[in-house]
Structures are given as C-alpha cells and as structure tokens.
Regions:
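Helix-to-loop junctions at the C-terminal end of transmembrane segments
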Residues: 52-66, 149-150, 248-261, 347
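Structural signature of the two symmetry-related core transmembrane helices
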Residues: 69-83, 263-278
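Cytoplasmic helix-loop-helix junction between adjacent transmembrane helices
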Residues: 99-133
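A membrane-interface helix-boundary motif in multi-pass transporters
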Residues: 147-163, 344-363
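Interfacial helix-cap and linker-helix signal at transmembrane-aqueous boundaries
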Residues: 29-30, 60-61, 132, 147-152, ...
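Hydrophobic core of transmembrane alpha-helices in multi-pass small-molecule transporters
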Residues: 12, 81-82, 91-109, 207, ...
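Helix-loop boundary and gating motifs at the non-cytosolic
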Residues: 1-47, 199-237
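Juxtamembrane intracellular "pre-TM" segments in multi-pass secondary transporters
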Residues: 1, 172-206
Length: 377
C-alpha cells in the first residue's frame, strides 16, 4: 500500500520511545530516590494528560482536517518540554515537566492512528502489518536499553529519550498533508455513535483493562529487580512480551475471518486475568514468568487490534480522530492513571501479590461485562 513505510517508521520510533519510558522510567525515578507513592504519582501524570489532551487535539483535527500538521506540532513540543528534565530533577519540577511533555506526546498517537485508517481505506486488515513495526521499535529499545544500563548509569535515560522523541518528529514529516483527506462522512453525530451499547461496553471494558495494568506498567521492572533479575533480563522479558504481540498482529486478518470480534475481545480479557495471577504468585519462577510474558500476545496484541477493529466498524473517517482520542483517554488515560495511583499507594503497604490479585479481579469483571453486553459480531 501507499505510504506503508512512512507510516511504519513513525510507529517504530513512537513505540520505541514507549519501550524506553515504560520499563525504565520507574527504575530511573527509583534511582533518584523517590518512594513508591511518588513514583506512582509521577507515572500517573503522564497518563492523566492522556485523559484530556487527545480529546482536545482530536476535536481540532476533525474540525480542521489538519491531522498530520497537529501530529508534527505536538511532536516537536514533546521534544522541547521533555528537555526541561535536564534542568532539575526535583519532585515539583518533574510534575510540571511531565505534565507539559505528556500533554503533547499523548496527542500525537491517536491522530496518527486516524491517519493510518484513513489511508488504509478499504484495506483495514493491513493495520496489523503497519502497527507491527511499533512493536519492533519497542523490542529494540527495551532490549538495547536493558543491555545498555548494565554498563552506563540509568540517569542518562532522559537524554536517550530526547533522541527518540526527536525521531518521532522527523518521521512525522514523511506524510504529506494532502494524503490525509477524510474519505467518508457519517450521517450520525459523534454523540449518537458513542451511545451505542457496543461502543459503551467497549470503552468500559478498555478502561478496566488498562486499570488492571497499573501494577504492571508502574512496578513490574522494580518487582523483577527486587527479586534479583538483572536489568538485562528485565529488558529481555519486556521484549519477549512484545515479540508475542507481533505474532498476533501478523495473523489478525485470519482471526477476524474465523472468529467473532466480541469473542476475541473477551478472550483477551480472560487471558490477561490469568497473566496477572501468574506474575503475582510465581515471580521467582523464570519459566512461568516467561510464559506470562508470552500472554502479552492477548493482553495487548489481541486486545488492541480488536478494539481498533470495533472502533473502525462504528466510526466513519469524519469521527476517527475523536474516536481514537476517546479510546486513548478512557483506557490508557483514565484507566492507566487510576491504576498507577492505586498501585503506587498500595505497593509498599500490601505488597506485589495483592496488587496483582486486584488487577486480575478487575479483568474478570471486564470479562463478564463484555461477554454479556457486547454485540455478537
């Protein structure tokens, strides 16, 4: 398809930055001397802005049609504001910088997802082949940085991230603005679509799914390090999980052909509940932890691909920017932020096991909701 590599390389660097941020930011803050409460709060800031920023940018993009220009604008400001971390590392300064940086960083991806589906047109099944490169970027950085931080100080993480954020901006220049003209217009308003029962159930389930990821995204690396896993091994385990999700992206077209989307979505939630139980109870068993990481094929790969498919089925190009923004803000934003805060406040008091238990329970609730009320499609 046209623009395949231009789209793919953006995902490569965007999720490459995510592969540096999610596994190692908690360790970086831990090295600076912050306790679990502070780490949870600082991680939550990045997710809180995801509740607001994407919706603002999504509304602007859909009403102006300037999706790629907004991606470029938000990407360059991401670099500018994140560079402020080099000035000071106090808690109050980090709060300000993380808020400003993430307000723009979180704005770019939903609009780029809308651009991707716009360009795919009648070939949405090719999304997995493009999004796969984001997973490749995640693997490269998480594995490379895991090895790197065995030899250099993790306090250099911000400098490395600035380089990755700069690459995001550069790759956004590869897509011409005229390539992203809307293809279809809906006769229904955005409000009418989001009040459909299936859409409501989707967003509730996505919120719960990302809520359950709180202990994982915030403390998984610290949890592993506390149980004598090396940073190289920590990076390898993160990378393994993403390798598994790539496998799912490669076969999504066949899965959509053979199985109903609602069944695939519910299955991803159920497998995620099992994954949290395995991590909580068997952290000292490397074979079980390896198996648990392979389950990321379902807890992110399958889950995200099916969610994208349902959104594409329900929202026209006219509303894709707002739809992608709402998906990000409700799930990764609200769900992720609340999950991060809960795990931050309970980690030192109740320990890892309790955190992964409540995460599993949340997933089971999501299973019941999606199984009972999501349309059989």
């Amino acid at each position: 398809m046209k623009y395949y590599w231009q789209l793919s390389v953006f995902y490569l660097f965007y999720f490459g930055s995510l592969g540096a941020l999610i596994p190692y930011w908690g360790l970086y803050l831990h090295t600076l001397g912050f306790d679990a409460n502070a780490i949870g709060e600082l991680m939550a800031i990045i997710l809180v802005t995801k509740m607001v920023a994407p919706n603002i940018w999504g509304w602007i993009a859909d009403h102006t049609g300037k999706h790629i220009l907004l991606v470029r604008f938000s990407s360059i400001l991401t670099v500018v504001f994140f560079a402020g971390i080099l000035i000071d590392q106090s808690y109050s300064w980090l709060v300000i910088i993380l808020f400003l940086f993430s307000f723009f960083w979180n704005a770019a991806l939903p609009q780029f997802e809308a651009i991707t589906f716009n360009l795919l047109g009648k070939q949405p099944h090719q999304y997995g082949m493009i999004r796969m490169w984001g997973s490749v970027g995640f693997i490269i950085t998480v594995a490379l940085f895991g090895w790197l931080f065995q030899h250099i100080s993790i306090t250099l993480l911000p400098i490395l991230l600035i380089g990755l954020f700069s690459c995001i901006w550069l790759t956004s220049l590869l897509i011409p603005e005229q390539a992203t003209t809307n293809l279809s217009v809906s006769t229904e308003s955005f409000y009418q679509i989001i009040t459909r029962p299936t859409v409501i159930v989707l967003f509730i389930s996505c919120f719960l799914m990302q809520l359950s990821h709180g202990p994982y995204y915030t403390f998984y690396s610290i949890y592993l390090e506390d149980n004598d896993y090396s940073r190289h091994m920590i990076g390898s385990l993160w990378a393994l999980g993403v390798v598994a999700e790539i496998g799912v992206f490669l076969i999504m077209q066949q899965l959509f052909t053979r199985f109903a989307t609602n069944n695939l979505f519910t299955l991803s939630l159920a497998i995620t509940a099992l994954r949290w139980l395995l991590i909580g109870y068997y952290i000292e068993s490397l074979p079980i932890i390896i198996f648990a990481q392979l389950l990321n094929a379902a807890s992110f790969g399958l889950y995200h691909a099916v969610a994208m498919q349902i959104i594409r089925q329900n929202f026209s190009d006219q509303h894709q920017g707002k739809a992608q923004a709402l998906y990000g803000s409700v799930s990764f934003g609200a769900g992720g932020a609340i999950g991060s805060l809960i795990s931050g406040y309970t980690w030192e008091i109740y320990g890892a096991l309790v955190n992964y238990l409540w995460a599993a329970v949340i997933c089971i609730i999501a299973v019941l909701i999606s199984w009972k009320w999501m349309d059989k499609t």
